[in-house]
């Protein structure tokens, strides 16, 4: 996992403090840094992907079922992270079947049915 983050940090000029902050914000700690991503749990993989977005300073996050594989507290932490990202002018596109949670996070909503937009609000 550390190599993955270091690669992206190099690409954008992020330093060790920014990597550590991204890991903390994503709910990860240094104990997992030597673990290969393929050996991580589903929730840890999602958190690693979020840490990469944070290190990359991505202006757009495309999250497909981001709450899958997370326990209830992990889902709440992810929601907090999404809210912080949006407050920092990050655009978040969230694809989810959890409509209640998505609506609580959304500034705008688009429903897709059969591959076409069926509702926009």
Predicted regions and their residues:
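Conserved ABC ATPase signature
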Residues: 36-40
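ABC ATPase C-loop
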Residues: 53-54
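Short loop immediately C-terminal to the Walker-B catalytic DE motif
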Residues: 67-68
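Conserved ABC ATPase "signature" region
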Residues: 16-32
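Catalytic Walker B motif of ABC-type/P-loop ATPase nucleotide-binding domains
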Residues: 61-64
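Q-loop/switch helix immediately C-terminal to the Walker
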Residues: 1-11
């Amino acid at each position: 996992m550390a190599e993955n983050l270091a690669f992206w940090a190099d690409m954008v000029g992020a330093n060790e403090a920014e990597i550590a902050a991204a890991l903390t914000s994503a709910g990860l700690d240094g104990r997992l840094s030597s673990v290969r991503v393929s050996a991580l749990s589903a929730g840890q993989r999602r958190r690693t992907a979020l840490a990469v977005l944070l290190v990359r300073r991505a202006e757009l996050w495309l999250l497909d079922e981001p709450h899958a594989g997370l326990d209830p507290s992990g889902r709440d932490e992810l929601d907090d992270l999404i809210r912080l990202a949006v407050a920092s002018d990050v655009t978040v596109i969230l694809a989810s079947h959890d409509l209640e949670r998505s609506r609580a996070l959304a500034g705008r909503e688009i429903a897709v049915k059969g591959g076409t937009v069926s509702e926009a609000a």
